From Swiss-Prot:
Enzyme type, top EC level: oxidoreductase
Motif Histidine box-3, residue range(s) on this chain: 315-319
Subcellular location: Endoplasmic reticulum membrane
Protein name: Omega-6 fatty acid desaturase, endoplasmic reticulum isozyme 2
Length: 383
């Protein structure tokens, strides 16, 4: 069923069957990727153009209704109520547009339909509308999926080893410092990553998602980076014309603040998917693709799980089979949990509490001195 009447099967036993802070096994698993795939009903890998588009229409319809109410009725309310109404609009519209962002992300994984060209067209339009360079991020994100959990080759939120921690980190390792760090990360983290590769893997020269000739991309990808840049510039020009016609404040209130919410949730979701005290990271001496893909965690965002198309609570399955559409990921997660066993981690900690805990506990990674596996690194916070 489409977006208007979902019949997804929830994962069995939503409460964690094991302590979510218990370390995930780091030894090579006894199961293979093909065994995991065989446990999933075949229809979960089928992509439907109509069903996928139903979610696009559903999200955009809600977004338009919110915009219409905010721009046509809120100004009629008394001052304090008008401001409260706009605050609600910013939060709700930001959440809905995060769902749109997730659909565009699926297009980049070829999980929207069986037609790569259609996926790229839809993804380019939706991501450009949110000022995301579609192909640029598609290619760097693909490398993230190919190297998840690798300390040398993963693309984003690569944890630092203790020897690489900045001198000022100890001064931020306190409640006020964490508030400041989280505020900057959630508001500026996404644009800084795209423009300056902040929190990304190190390259031998300056890396930028807008640079077709940057080290992130190969020669055959450069033309599509130009297309991504053109898409973002077209939207920026459209926003400029809107600002000239309606005023800058109107554009900021209607579009800019919800976009900040989108960017904040994007960073938070990614951070919490790959940052957890129970998750290992690996150097090249230990890393392999399957263990890296399993070094992620499913989270519980309450009702926002559905708003975000379950990218939050089916992320393990997504890393194993990224071309699977989101509307089958819940059923697939239920199917693979018995096979994954302790390699599967679901943490039901409320996401705000989890954000604070991870910011406090996960400052750097280091090998566990009690084991002989020196290529396996775990989070620590002792500065």
């Amino acid at each position: 069923m489409g977006a208007g009447g979902r019949t997804d099967v929830p994962p069995a036993n939503r409460k964690s069957e094991v302590d979510p802070l218990k370390r995930v096994p780091f030894e090579k698993p006894q199961f293979s990727l093909s065994q995991i795939k065989k446990a999933i009903p075949p229809h979960c890998f089928q992509r439907s153009v109509l069903r996928s588009f139903s979610y696009v229409v559903y999200d955009l319809t809600i977004a338009f209704c919110l915009y219409y109410v905010a721009t046509h009725y809120f100004h009629l309310l008394p001052g304090p109520l008008s401001f409260r109404g706009m605050a609600i609009y910013w939060a709700v519209q930001g959440c809905i547009l995060t769902g749109v962002w997730v659909i565009a992300h699926e297009c980049g994984h070829h999980a929207f339909s069986d037609y790569q060209l259609l996926d790229d067209i839809v993804g380019l339009i939706l991501h450009s509308a949110l000022l995301v360079p579609y192909f640029s991020w598609k290619y760097s994100h693909r490398r993230h999926h190919s190297n998840t959990g690798s300390l040398e080759r993963d693309e984003v939120f690569v944890p630092k080893q203790k020897s690489c921690i900045k001198w000022y980190s100890k001064y931020l390792n306190n409640p006020p410092g964490r508030v400041l760090t989280l505020a900057v990360t959630l508001t500026l983290g996404w644009p800084l990553y795209l423009a300056l590769n902040v929190s990304g893997r190190p390259y031998d020269r300056f890396a930028c998602h807008y640079d077709p000739y940057g080290p992130i991309y190969s020669d055959r990808e450069r033309l599509q980076i130009y297309i991504s840049d053109a898409g973002v510039l077209a939207v920026v020009y459209g926003l400029f014309r809107l600002a000239m016609a309606k005023g800058l404040a109107w554009v900021v209130c209607v579009y800019g603040v919800p976009l900040l919410v989108v960017n904040g949730f994007l960073v938070l979701i990614t951070f919490l998917q790959h940052t957890h005290p129970a998750l290992p990271h690996y150097t090249s001496s230990e890393w392999d693709w399957l263990r890296g893909a399993l070094a992620t965690v499913d989270r519980d965002y309450g009702i926002l799980n559905k708003v975000f198309h379950n990218i939050t609570d089916t992320h393990v399955a997504h890393h194993l089979f990224s071309t699977m559409p989101h509307y089958h990921a819940m059923e697939a997660t239920k199917a693979i949990k018995p096979i994954l066993g302790e390699y599967y981690r679901f943490d039901e900690t409320p996401f705000v509490k989890a954000m604070w805990r991870e910011a406090r506990e996960c400052i750097y990674v280091e090998p566990d001195q009690s084991t002989e596996s020196k290529g396996v690194f775990w989070y620590n916070n002792k500065l």
